């Protein structure tokens, strides 16, 4: 049976030492004793860090030492509900990215070009979350950048080289590793051209950024300031080749569905044409018909679209998908709040109808999965405020009436057999 020693007290004769780092029990917070050895809390934390790093890159590998698309999508499925096609495209892209790097190291006559990806989908459908989940499960440097903060060189804001700087930081400034990394650029629809006439004014945060991104996305040797750019003009620059860096761009492209629908209406003229009202079709359904010309009309320049050969559209999340998002993934919202309540020794439970009502509210707000947390916070706010002061509460039950605001959460007390509704206002 192991014992735990604190850091206070004891004379020098009976002082215990960590068998790994050699620190005494007085130099650490805790010392855990085994049959013949001791380990301190600092060494335990170090071991946990090593295990986490091992787990991060412990995916099943194919014969070439490359993570298989099936394995990548299997891990994505644990965290992200739905969007099967987008997950398939991302899994294949990452798999091919590894293979291309492996092929480049072996040499050969055929040079494998990279296929950058554009993710298009309505807000709250999981574009950014897919990228964040991908970052956790791959073992190449990965960084996320926000396109809204970028400006053309020479203007107030971030240079596009700052994206490569973030990738360098995620690779601990190892240039070789950074050159094999993956970059996700979010909110790329916000850098669309502000006007159809390019000669009206200089568009430093729109078309100017697209022009600046062209070369690093295609492949160039970028000069990256290690201290972050314009504030330190005397610093030496690091040279990073972006040829093998995979770029994934994502955006909601609000209004793109109307451009696609308008194009469809032009081609559906005549007595035999099938007329479908735009209001009868969901955004995700319309986006499936996306063509590069629609993105040009939206405000992306043709050269920028040409650097993103793979187009992946994401679906709207329906009621059933939102219910699954609430309860099924490893870090589902319901599980997160249940863990919060467990810290107060209280069980939190939701009726099935309550989850369905939450999903309906999110659909009404048109915020997708992103709106689920704000709805949950509003429902549970009063309960989380009162609970620390209440004694004997064993369980809190949320019904559909609670979600609609027609009732209070049900409090079940440990010292009573009957269920007691919370009467306080």
From Swiss-Prot:
Keyword terms of this UniProt record: ATP-binding, Chaperone, Metal-binding, Nucleotide-binding, Zinc
InterPro entries named in the record: AAA+_ATPase, ATP-dep_Clp_protease_ClpX, ATPase_AAA_core, Clp_ATPase_C, Clp_protease_ATP-bd_su_ClpX, ClpX_bact, P-loop_NTPase, Znf_CppX_C4
Protein name per UniProt: ATP-dependent Clp protease ATP-binding subunit ClpX
Subunit structure: Component of the ClpX-ClpP complex. Forms a hexameric ring that, in the presence of ATP, binds to fourteen ClpP subunits assembled into a disk-like structure with a central cavity, resembling the structure of eukaryotic proteasomes.
Organism of origin: Allorhizobium ampelinum (strain ATCC BAA-846 / DSM 112012 / S4) (Agrobacterium vitis (strain S4))
Binding residues for Zn(2+): 18, 21, 40, 43
Span of domain ClpX-type ZB: 6-59
GO BP annotation list: cell division; proteolysis involved in protein catabolic process
Gene Ontology, cellular component aspect: HslUV protease complex
HAMAP family (UniProt xref): ClpX
Task performed by this protein: ATP-dependent specificity component of the Clp protease. It directs the protease to specific substrates. Can perform chaperone functions in the absence of ClpP.
